From Swiss-Prot:
It comes from the Bacteria. This is Uncharacterized protein pXO2-52/BXB0059/GBAA_pXO2_0059. The lineage of its organism: Bacteria, Bacillati, Bacillota, Bacilli, Bacillales. Keywords: Plasmid.
Amino acid sequence: MDFQDIIFLMMDIKIEIYQDEKDMEKTEVAVKTEKTAIPFKWENPLEDTYTKMGYSESSPISAGGTFMG
C-alpha cells in the first residue's frame, strides 16, 4: 500500500462518515476504522517533523533556515 492508496482509503472513510452522520452507531464505527487504518495525524503531517527538528512557528528565521542580515 503506497501513500496514494492511503489517501483514497481516507477519502472513502470520510465519505462514509458524512453519509452516516444521522446514524450515530455507524458513524462511530467509521471513525474507529479511520483511526485503525490511518496511524498518523492527517491534520498536519509536518507538525511532528518540525517539532523534532527544533523549528518554531513563532520564529521567522526557522522557516527560511538562514538569517540574511
